[in-house]
């Protein structure tokens, strides 16, 4: 493990032309201190997590000391927000400090959120507050623990600097780590400002650093100089195809775990299919497909059940921005593959949650009838699947079924519809080759528990951690970090974090304010 000063920076993005961003020096926070560090993320960077406690670390990531090797940059991008194009976007409260290169040649962006004003801050103060920073810190750990691609947060730092929001709050910084911070909006910016040469340059950059397998062999690269324009376009079509696939896989993951992003603007969409920008996000408590986690989303544009279609809308916006590089007919053909990838990945995830190995056509009926059941009974989505993970094939037999149904008593107001669905589920399980044997069924249940988490970041838990942190107690942040980093494990000492939310906990309203 390395010390902070031993990290190797290779800042490729800052070497791009100045139209891609503006060099900015972070503005200092007063009396900074460490709130929490994520050891898993530190390990990704080959950084000793104990470094986070040093004054060098704390000062370097709160604008009080320049970190050697970094080249702070506010990235310029635009995007569609709630369906409307906004040309005045960019890093308004954060800076790309640089890119850390590990011993395995993995490259990680280091981004400082809450670093102060930039040319893209508009009327904002460029700051982040402790409240929203805690949510992103824990939210990214939760998605990563669930096996869904996301940005990461290395550490969270607090200060005595006061920031004006609905009330005066403590300023904070979050050290965000990601494979890339490139958004759909980066390409939209270059397209709508008619910088087509730079658009091609950015596409080439993305392919070189993140999709190198799309590149041809060295000899074929030399032949590119004489290739026809249409031949040259093929690699950009392959790039868009990859982005469509990654986005579809991401949305399948979100829908399977009940995650609602809340503000799926194109400037919040990662070209690498990462969960990006944790604002008013939320996880389903009771299963409600119409769930709106952002109280500013009056029309429900970004409701939970709208996420698959919105992702395609966003991909269409990206595809349009790439038309200087890809024929429109090719863009349309690539976009048409989205639903197939989404359905394939989502169905696979749902079969895993139900302990089904074989793919059968009637599975869609089993899925839809289950969702109708959960919605009609307002059943807790996560607790249902976790409980189901302890129900063996034998438990579903005629003689054992009544006892099995009792395990769901706390989740259902009426168990008759549940009994009907469980009988259909038992029939479906009978088609699985290994459930007839005890060992095979035990293995199935073990696998189910690896796909049905015991712990998710419920809004009320995040709020409790925030309330304690604002009083100077960061214990709950670290406790939640522990269970969310491995949410499929039992963590018996933290059973209370797996409970159904209290009534007030289901009614929390989350805004974009950060």
From Swiss-Prot:
The reaction(s) this protein catalyses: L-seryl-[protein] + ATP = 3-O-(5'-adenylyl)-L-seryl-[protein] + diphosphate; L-threonyl-[protein] + ATP = 3-O-(5'-adenylyl)-L-threonyl-[protein] + diphosphate; L-tyrosyl-[protein] + ATP = O-(5'-adenylyl)-L-tyrosyl-[protein] + diphosphate; L-histidyl-[protein] + UTP = N(tele)-(5'-uridylyl)-L-histidyl-[protein] + diphosphate
Residues annotated for ATP binding in this entry: 90, 92-93, 113, 125-126, 176, 183, 277
Gene Ontology MF term list: AMPylase activity; ATP binding; magnesium ion binding
InterPro entries documented for this protein: SelO
E.C. no: 2.7.7.-, 2.7.7.108
Residue sites binding Mg(2+) per the record: 268, 277
Official protein name in the record: Protein nucleotidyltransferase YdiU
């Amino acid at each position: 493990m390395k010390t902070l000063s031993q990290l190797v920076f290779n800042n490729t993005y800052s070497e791009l032309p100045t139209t891609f961003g503006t060099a900015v020096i972070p503005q200092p926070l007063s009396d900074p201190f460490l709130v929490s560090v994520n050891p898993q993320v530190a390990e990704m960077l080959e950084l000793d997590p104990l470094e986070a406690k040093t004054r060098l670390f704390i000062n370097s990531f709160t604008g009080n000391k320049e970190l050697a090797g970094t080249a702070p940059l506010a990235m310029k991008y635009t995007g569609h927000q709630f369906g409307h194009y906004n040309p005045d976007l960019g890093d308004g409260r954060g800076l790309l400090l640089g890119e850390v290169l590990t011993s395995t040649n993995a490259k990680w962006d280091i981004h400082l959120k809450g670093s102060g004003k930039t040319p893209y801050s508009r009327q904002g103060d460029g700051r982040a507050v402790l409240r929203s920073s805690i949510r992103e810190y824990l939210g990214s750990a939760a998605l990563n623990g669930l096996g869904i691609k996301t940005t990461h947060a290395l550490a969270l730092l607090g200060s005595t600097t006061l920031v004006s929001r609905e009330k005066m709050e403590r300023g904070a910084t979050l050290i965000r780590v990601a494979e890339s911070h490139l958004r759909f909006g980066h390409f939209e910016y270059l397209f709508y400002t008619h910088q087509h040469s730079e658009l091609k340059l950015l596409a080439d950059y993305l392919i070189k650093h993140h999709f190198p397998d799309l590149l041809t062999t060295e000899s074929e690269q030399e032949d590119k100089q004489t290739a026809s324009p249409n031949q040259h376009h093929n690699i950009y079509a392959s790039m868009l195809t990859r982005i469509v696939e990654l986005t579809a896989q991401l949305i399948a993951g979100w829908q399977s775990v009940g995650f609602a992003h809340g503000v799926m603007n194109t400037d919040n969409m990662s070209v690498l299919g990462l969960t990006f920008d944790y604002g008013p996000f939320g996880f389903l408590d009771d299963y409600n497909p119409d769930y709106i986690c952002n109280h500013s989303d009056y029309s429900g544009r970004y409701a939970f059940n709208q996420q698959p279609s919105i992702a395609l809308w966003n991909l269409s916006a990206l595809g349009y921005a790439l038309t200087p590089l890809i024929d429109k007919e090719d863009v349309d053909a690539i976009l048409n593959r989205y639903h197939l990838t989404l359905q394939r990945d989502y169905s696979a995830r749902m079969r895993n949650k139900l302990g089904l190995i074989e793919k059968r056509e009637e599975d869609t009926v089993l899925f839809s009838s289950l969702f109708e059941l959960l919605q009609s009974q307002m059943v807790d989505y996560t607790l249902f699947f976790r409980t189901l993970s302890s129900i063996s094939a034998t438990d579903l037999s005629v003689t054992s079924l009544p006892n099995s149904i009792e395990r769901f008593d706390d989740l259902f107001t009426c168990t008759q519809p549940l009994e009907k669905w469980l009988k259909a589920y038992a029939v479906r399980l009978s088609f699985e080759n290994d459930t007839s044997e005890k060992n095979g069924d035990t293995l199935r249940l073990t696998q189910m528990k690896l796909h049905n988490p015991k712990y998710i970041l419920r809004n009320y838990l995040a709020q409790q951690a925030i309330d304690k942190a604002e009083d100077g107690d960061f214990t709950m942040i670290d406790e939640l970090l522990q269970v969310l980093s491995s949410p499929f494990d039992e963590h018996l000492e933290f059973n209370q974090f797996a409970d159904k939310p209290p009534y007030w906990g289901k009614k929390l309203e989350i805004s974009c304010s950060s």
